């Protein structure tokens, strides 16, 4: 294993998937171009460089930071000679080495991405709730299983989260808020451990009970499950929002309650973005924002549909960023093209 590979793997442990994946991907791309040239030309210009094949890091490309790192996608075609490519690899080595030296004693923190058996989330350690939770649903995965019981599940903290940043059950006790699921328990009944994991407090957020979590939010969750009868596959991203409000002085403020000794944030709103893939491979998107307040059950869910971009701006995230908007056939039930 080369020094640069060790550095990249070290970075993967400290910086998270996104940055390390970019470094390794960029390095691997140039290595492939270089090896192809050597094979074709018989050159041994880097015979003294011990570069081994490594699998790429799995990247979770469906949700990303709103300001992505710029990468030249035409880099391969611009590098016209083997020598230039060797130089490029050396520059990547220097880049990763310098970063490693600067951050020798660790990064203060990056998004904590947690992959469970049947869903993935990004945990917000400051607010003690998730930034987003991502699910993949289809008709087969939602088939009822008599051996699966919600009554066996217990709300519990995720031990993988540092104790400084966890929410605990006592934070919710007496708060007046429900421990509201982001990845709905009803979406994960194909195995007991799948539904069990939806009860980790990392998947919870303080939600108003009567009129919201137990009613209108539940209606939205049931609607999403219904979509598995319409689409071949359904992809769901759910999370909290903390939206500004105009106050008496005419200025906008972001104000939200915190509960418990761990100061768990109470979101002002929740979003849910859904992409359905049809049997003929068309993609359709729906986006919802609901206030964390009691909602009349007679209000149609379509009243809460919003442009997806409005959620992205408010959340500081780009959702389904591997899908160009012009590839969608419908957004919120309306034809895009």
Give the residues covered by each predicted segment.
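Domain-level detector for secreted/extracellular nuclease and nuclease-toxin modules, and
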Residues: 1-337
């Amino acid at each position: 294993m080369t020094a640069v590979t060790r550095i990249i793997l070290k970075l993967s442990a400290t910086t998270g998937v996104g940055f390390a994946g970019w470094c390794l991907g960029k390095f691997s791309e140039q290595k492939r171009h270089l090896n192809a040239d050597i094979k074709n030309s018989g050159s041994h210009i880097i015979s003294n460089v011990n570069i081994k094949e490594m699998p790429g890091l799995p990247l979770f490309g469906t949700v990303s930071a709103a300001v992505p790192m710029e990468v030249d996608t035409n880099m391969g075609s611009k590098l016209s000679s083997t020598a230039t490519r060797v130089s490029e690899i050396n520059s990547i080595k220097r880049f990763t080495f310098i970063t490693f030296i600067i951050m020798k004693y660790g990064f203060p923190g990056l998004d904590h991405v947690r992959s469970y058996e049947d869903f993935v989330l990004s945990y917000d350690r400051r607010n003690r709730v998730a930034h987003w939770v991502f699910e993949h649903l289809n008709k087969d995965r939602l088939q009822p299983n008599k051996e699966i019981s919600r009554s066996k599940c217990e709300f519990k903290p995720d031990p993988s989260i540092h104790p400084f940043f966890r929410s605990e059950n006592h934070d919710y006790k007496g708060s007046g808020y429900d421990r509201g699921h982001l990845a709905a328990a009803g979406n994960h009944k194909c195995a007991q451990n799948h539904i069990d994991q939806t009860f980790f407090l990392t998947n919870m957020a303080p939600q108003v009970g009567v009129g919201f979590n137990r009613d209108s939010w539940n209606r939205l969750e049931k609607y999403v499950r219904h979509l598995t009868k319409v689409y071949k596959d359904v992809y769901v991203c759910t999370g909290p929002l903390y939206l500004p409000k105009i106050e008496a002085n005419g200025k906008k403020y972001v104000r939200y309650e915190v509960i418990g000794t761990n100061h768990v944030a109470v979101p002002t709103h929740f979003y849910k973005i859904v992409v359905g893939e049809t049997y003929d491979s068309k993609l359709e998107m729906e986006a919802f924002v609901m206030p964390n307040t009691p909602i009349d059950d007679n209000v149609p869910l379509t009243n809460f549909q919003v442009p997806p971009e409005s959620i992205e701006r408010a959340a500081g995230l780009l959702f389904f960023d591997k899908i160009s908007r012009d590839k969608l056939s419908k957004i919120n039930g309306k034809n895009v093209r």
